[in-house]
């Protein structure tokens, strides 16, 4: 296992993300990277939450696009499920209703990363678990 933090790799920088992956040659990447915040931050910096989280996930996926042997576990979040989802939440409720308004930009970025991962699986044969 080769842990990596934001101090090791700037995931906003595609070249640095690629370099880290090439240098470490991982068999598996567990993507838990995200810009997160509380209710105040989520409401105040809505654009930053969606843009920054999209950049992080796009860079990780672009960095592995030419390396289909690298497996990726792309972690989601409870916020990707509808506001009125039953508790305990069932996977079948994904994309069946309105998201919690305070964190919908973050949730949409996570949902986009799931769809991007599915696209890489279908088009390039990557082994990605969302």
Predicted regions and their residues:
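Adenosine-cofactor binding site in Rossmann-like domains, unifying the SAM/SAH pocket
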Residues: 1-20
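Residue-level detector of structured alpha->beta connecting loops
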Residues: 25, 68-69, 125
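Conserved Rossmann-fold NAD(P)-dependent oxidoreductase catalytic core, especially the SDR/UDP-sugar
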Residues: 58-103
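Conserved beta-loop-beta element that borders a ligand/cofactor-binding pocket
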Residues: 76-77, 116-130
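Active-site helix of classical SDR
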Residues: 105, 109-112
């Amino acid at each position: 296992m080769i842990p990596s933090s934001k101090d090791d790799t700037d995931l906003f920088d595609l070249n640095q993300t690629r370099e880290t992956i090439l240098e470490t040659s991982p068999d598996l990447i567990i993507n838990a990277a995200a810009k997160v915040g509380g209710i105040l931050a989520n409401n105040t910096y809505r654009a930053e939450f969606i843009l920054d989280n999209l950049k992080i996930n796009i860079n990780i996926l672009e960095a592995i696009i030419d390396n289909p042997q690298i497996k990726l576990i792309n972690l989601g979040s409870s916020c990707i499920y509808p506001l009125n989802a039953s508790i305990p939440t069932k996977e079948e409720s994904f994309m069946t209703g309105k998201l919690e308004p305070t964190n919908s930009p973050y949730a949409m970025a996570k949902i986009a990363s799931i769809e991007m991962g599915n696209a890489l699986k279908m088009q390039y044969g990557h082994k990605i678990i969302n």
